[in-house]
């Protein structure tokens, strides 16, 4: 059995079912210990020794055999079969429900964590929590309760019956048990440590494989298949070595249990045979005693397995607890309210920002205002802080008080949900789900309105491309949209954002993979949306030339804000960037 702050509540939640399973288990144990008494009657009857039933002598004949042996044996077997089915359903069913709830809790908490967490913790490691570690917890919860309760009740009842038959022989039989418990406790701690190492090695292996599958095209392009294979073999060998070491310790524990059991059997046969020889025991009593000890063998084995499973379960639960203990950095403050109907005014007011683990400010005293319905381009060199600006607008990170306002509301005084609900976002990587094109475009809604989907696709100039596909809008995209081109991915992502009909549209370098003609068509279509506040991050100045306003960012600072013509005339750094891009375009044409 395992205990922890995130799993203890499930014992109470499943208490009625667990109690029912426990009752069935005790009933099975009782009838299991009734069977050795039947063995004694049969053997004594066949040997001509007295057959005692409830302390009274009985005649051993066919009627006795049917009434006192066969019928009780059949009833016991039926009760044991039904009881075992019942406790298996109760214990293992509870374990499945516990892991289902725990998995949901983990997923819900994961969704609340900030990007910083996922930058530190790799996807492969997280996936191993949802697979290997949860499977281990499920096994430990279900099997652990079974083994603990069965070892406790069956072992205790059997030892009591053995003690009543002969105190000294029972004392001798229990001596190896003390050594087993001491050895098991020591090995259990070592097993827990090795299981943690095993899970960590498996996580690293899973993450490496996941990263390779995602970057397979790059690996092939650079002809690095052999290098990556050698790396995988090294990680796989490390995983193998840890598993082998864990298996050695686990096997040693099992061998010790077997050794103790066999040694006790030798003691029982030796001293028990002596008692039979002296007349203190008859043959039937010796067989009955061995039958009780046979019932103790399973609890002894269960203790060994329980130590191993508990060690594994604790290690896996510790890893899961680390995830559930991860602090939710970006969350609503107490008493916040939803934004009312958003008009689209955005104001940055002397905003300075540094990433939580950063060593310097990535944004410094950023100030500019976007009026409702304006189209604004944000340009600057790579790493100047353009994407950070929209990350803060989307509340991906915490924003300093009094520095960012939407419709004159400080974003820290309104709910994060309402801020994000009012924004439609097209990220740089243009992530698409492994779903139909229709499903991707209508992602913001629970149902698919085909007319609205096609309207959004037309605005992003991707409708004609989709129509050329054999399945049209029902075409299923591969993982991350690998079955479509880069330009098509961008335009499908734009269509998804447009279909949301949010008052604020954010495009983070989202037309870089399309040609100039397609880019112009998309931007012209965006202007037709009345009241739409558009923020477009771009590297090409030509992309934002026609915007109502351009924000020029350099080294985390806003150097200039205004129309293209004004900036070209008044801002030297902006003019140099424009001239340089024109020279690059002319050189490319030549």
Question: Where do the model's predicted regions map?
Answer:
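Juxtamembrane loop-to-helix connectors within ABC transporter transmembrane domains
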Residues: 2, 91, 111-156
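Transmembrane helices of ABC transporter permease
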Residues: 13, 17-30, 76-80, 143-197, ...
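An intracellular "coupling" helix at the cytosolic face of ABC transporter transmembrane type-1 domains
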Residues: 13, 115-116, 132-141, 145, ...
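Helix-loop junctions and hydrophobic alpha-helical segments within the transmembrane domains
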Residues: 106, 110, 219, 320, ...
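Conserved catalytic Walker-motif region of ABC-type ATPase nucleotide-binding domains
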Residues: 110, 232, 320, 348-350
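Helix-loop-helix
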Residues: 161-178, 249-318, 324
